[in-house]
Design a protein with these regions (language model features):
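Catalytic cores and adjacent binding grooves of peptidoglycan-active enzymes
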Residues: 2-9, 15-89
Length: 89
């Protein structure tokens, strides 16, 4: 999965000292403009951190990609949020 991090357009957020990662994930998903939103490696329905990517080009195309990152066989898989909502509570 490509990243916009080198251009300063990605951020990883951890709600350790404020809102929970679930609250961050759902707030961004429901209220903000983004290109890619990833709930990273949830445990017991709680993401370990939240990855947000912004791209003006993709925003013009009205793209919003929401994923859940999981580890499987030592590899990271990005599952579409739709159909896997049960992994995030």
């Amino acid at each position: 999965m490509a990243s916009n991090g080198s251009a300063g357009l990605d951020i990883d957020m951890d709600g350790r000292y404020g809102p929970t990662n679930n609250e961050l994930f759902f707030y961004v998903k429901n209220n903000l403009r983004f290109y890619k939103l990833i709930a990273e490696f949830p445990k017991n329905g709680k993401p370990q951190w939240v990855h947000i990517s912004y791209s003006e080009t993709e925003l013009k195309n009205n793209e919003k990609n929401v994923f859940i990152a999981v580890s499987s066989g030592g590899r990271t898989r990005y599952l579409p949020y739709k159909g896997n909502e049960h992994l995030i509570k």
